[in-house]
């Protein structure tokens, strides 16, 4: 299934789960949806502003994103469509025939879907990131790779401490994703941050089989055509940052990909990513409540 637990990590997740349950009311869910919509509505214009300064030829495609499902979870899908309509999201409900016309290589496992025609996808995120990194250096940015172990203060100025060096700054931004908690805990800022472990595999030289990202909502996974082939991603696994990769989760992705696409070659590039997650599913963006010169992102 799309959700998995590492049982040795469950005791540590109990406070997070209790907070999550408190955020499952209709009122709290709508609060999250409205605020996330406001944030995501700014995402593409913000990317466009950055992309004006780098050459993205062939790295980003504007072919939309397709969500599909079968009848098993139709009630949930209708609620999602209703909420997005209320928020003004540009979405097109599509029939099985329209899904086939968009993506003829998908097996007929679906009964309906939604097409987001303005969606985009990256053909190679690493290449895009390296181009942005080069732009950062060109504009005078400096990059130091080291293990930051603690944050102290000189009056109000934050001091970053590594194993054998210290750096004093006027202001700092903590933007370490799921790993940020190691630093925020040292600041006595009890942010209920944890991680959703997501799995990835590639099927090399198969990107021609799809034109755009396709997400099968019943099983909680998606497939995106990329330079490396078809990237299959999905599942939410609660297990922290230290547990090893689960081969069962990889097998689950392989089976799901073949369930959607039929015969595929041997997969490549098994890897695990750590998505930061909070109980209300809203990000932490802005100044620290306790330290005015520290910002979170």
Briefly describe each language-model feature range.
Residues 1-96:
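Dinucleotide-binding Rossmann-like beta1-alpha1 core, especially the glycine-rich loop
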Residues 31-44, 66-76, 101-102, 115-134, ...:
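Short beta-strand to alpha-helix junction loop
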Residues 60-62, 145, 193-196, 261-273:
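A short coil-to-beta-strand element that immediately follows conserved catalytic motifs
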Residues 75-87, 99, 106-171:
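Helical element adjacent to the flavin cofactor pocket in flavoenzyme catalytic cores
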Residues 91, 217-218, 258-297:
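C-terminal catalytic lobe of FAD-dependent flavoproteins
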Residues 112-119, 123-134, 148-149, 164, ...:
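Flavin (primarily FAD) cofactor-binding/catalytic cores of flavoenzymes
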Residues 153, 160-211, 263:
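Central helical "cap/lid" subdomain
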Residues 226-261:
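Conserved FAD/dinucleotide-binding core of flavoprotein oxidoreductases
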């Amino acid at each position: 299934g799309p959700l998995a637990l590492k049982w040795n990590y469950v005791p540590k997740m109990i406070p997070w789960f209790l907070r999550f349950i408190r955020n499952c009311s209709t009122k709290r869910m709508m609060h999250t949806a409205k605020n996330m919509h406001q944030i995501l509505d700014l995402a593409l214009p913000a990317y466009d502003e950055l992309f004006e300064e780098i050459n993205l030829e062939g790295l980003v495609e504007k072919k939309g994103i397709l969500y599909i499902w079968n009848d098993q979870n139709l009630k949930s899908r209708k609620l999602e469509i209703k909420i997005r309509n209320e928020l003004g999201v540009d979405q097109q409900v599509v029939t099985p025939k329209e899904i086939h016309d968009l993506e003829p290589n998908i097996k007929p496992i679906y009964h309906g879907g939604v097409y987001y025609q303005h969606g985009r996808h990256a053909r190679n995120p690493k290449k895009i990131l390296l181009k942005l990194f080069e732009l950062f250096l060109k504009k005078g940015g400096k990059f130091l790779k080291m293990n930051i172990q603690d944050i102290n203060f000189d009056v109000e100025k934050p001091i970053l401490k590594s194993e054998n060096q210290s750096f004093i700054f006027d202001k700092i931004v903590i933007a370490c994703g799921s790993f940020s908690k190691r630093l925020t805990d040292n600041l006595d800022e009890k942010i209920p941050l944890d991680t959703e472990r997501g799995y990835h595999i590639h099927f090399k030289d198969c990107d021609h089989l799809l034109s755009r990202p396709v997400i099968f909502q019943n099983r909680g996974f998606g497939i995106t055509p990329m330079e490396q082939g078809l990237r299959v991603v999905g599942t939410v696994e609660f297990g922290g940052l230290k547990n090893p990769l689960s081969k069962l989760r990889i097998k689950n992705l392989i089976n799901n990909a073949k369930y959607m696409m039929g015969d595929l070659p041997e997969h490549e590039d098994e890897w695990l990513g750590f998505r930061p997650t909070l109980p209300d599913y809203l990000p932490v963006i802005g100044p620290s409540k306790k330290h005015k010169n520290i910002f979170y992102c």
